Curated annotation (Swiss-Prot):
Its main location: cytoplasm. This is Small ribosomal subunit protein eS1B. One of its GO terms (cellular component) is cytosolic small ribosomal subunit. InterPro entries: Ribosomal_eS1, Ribosomal_eS1_CS, Ribosomal_eS1_euk. It holds the Pfam family Ribosomal_S3Ae. The modification N-acetylalanine is found at residue 2. It is found in: Cytoplasm. Coiled coil: none annotated. Signal peptide: none annotated. GO terms for molecular function: structural constituent of ribosome.
């Protein structure tokens, strides 16, 4: 009989299960902090594998983009149809300091705006902010019925639409190029630019449902930690940001 290893004896018992390893044991949680431009600064939490050896968790978190409903950031359901993108620029302990990365509309809101018997006007422009962020801004508007109009439809002539589109581009360039990214965010929340377009185009065409429907970040300047900390209020521990006002006050009539 040949002397050798008995394969039957070396085998383990059948039916034994491997010890279950919790995948979350190797991960750690981080708090996502929105800029102080928004009212609610606590966006949520995210996780990543713990730092091991040369692999640093902070490197994997920088550049992450989160999409958040503006209603959650502002604490108001009036903004539920708009989504804000926030990008992680710096990691401080367990806090992720984010910056504005873009804005978009929900698809159901956009579909609800498009109706029969009216003309759609769209315009977009690529513009640089005062702090060297290159953005592409998209605007949308619809024609509306004039006072005492009998006609059912509100279709506009193409020449009028070209005039309106030109005016929209001019206003967007002016409103974006003269402000920083943080100041622009404060304008986008109460839709100041949309109201400015409505006021300026009143003599050409009466418009309704005027919105900045999308803001896309194309290029950003060299990272500056000081400006990011200033955007987050230095300490970045406060849960509440500054309330953005629309700049319009309700007029109360003394007598009817």
């Amino acid at each position: 009989m040949a002397v050798g290893k008995n394969k039957r004896l070396s085998k383990g018992k059948k039916g034994l299960k491997k010890k279950a390893v919790d995948p979350f044991a190797r991960k750690e949680w981080f708090d996502i902090k929105a800029p102080s431009t928004f009212e609610n600064r606590n966006v949520g939490k995210t996780l990543i594998n713990k730092s091991t050896g040369l692999k640093n968790a902070a490197d994997g978190l920088k550049g992450r983009v989160f999409e958040v409903c503006l209603a959650d950031l502002q604490g108001s359901e009036d903004h539920s149809y708009r989504k804000v993108k926030l990008r992680v620029d710096e990691v401080q302990g367990k806090n992720l300091l984010t910056n504005f990365h873009g804005l978009d509309f929900t698809s159901d809101k956009l579909r609800s705006l498009v109706r029969k018997w009216q003309s759609l006007v769209e315009a977009n422009v690529t513009v640089k902010t005062a702090d060297d962020y290159v953005l592409r801004v998209f605007a949308i508007a619809f024609t509306k019925r004039q006072a005492n109009q009998v006609k059912k439809t509100t279709y506009a002539q193409s020449s009028k639409l070209r005039e309106v589109r030109k005016k929209m581009i001019e206003i967007m360039q002016r409103e974006v190029s003269n402000v920083t990214l943080a100041q622009l965010t404060s304008k986008l929340i109460p839709e100041v630019i949309g109201r400015e377009i409505e006021k300026s185009t009143q003599s050409i065409l009466p418009l309704q449902n005027i919105h900045i429907r999308k803001v896309k970040l194309l290029k950003q300047p060299k990272f500056d930690l000081g400006s990011l900390l200033a955007l987050h209020g230095e300490g970045s521990t406060e849960e509440k940001g500054k309330k953005v006002s629309s700049g319009y006050k309700d007029v109360v009539l003394e007598s009817v």
